[in-house]
Amino acid sequence: AWQDLNAGW
């Protein structure tokens, strides 16, 4: 789940 959000970073 975090990996998807980190993609925006």
Curated annotation (Swiss-Prot):
Q: Which terms are listed as keywords in the entry?
A: Amidation, Neuropeptide
- Organ and tissue specificity: Neurons located in two ventral cell clusters in the subesophageal ganglion.
Q: What does this protein do?
A: Suppresses spontaneous contractions of the hindgut and oviduct.
What are the Tryptophan amide sites (modified residues) in this protein? 9
Q: Which organism is it from?
A: Locusta migratoria (Migratory locust)
Q: What is the name of the protein in this document?
A: Locustamyoinhibiting peptide
Q: Name one GO biological process term.
A: neuropeptide signaling pathway
| UniProt superkingdom | Eukaryota
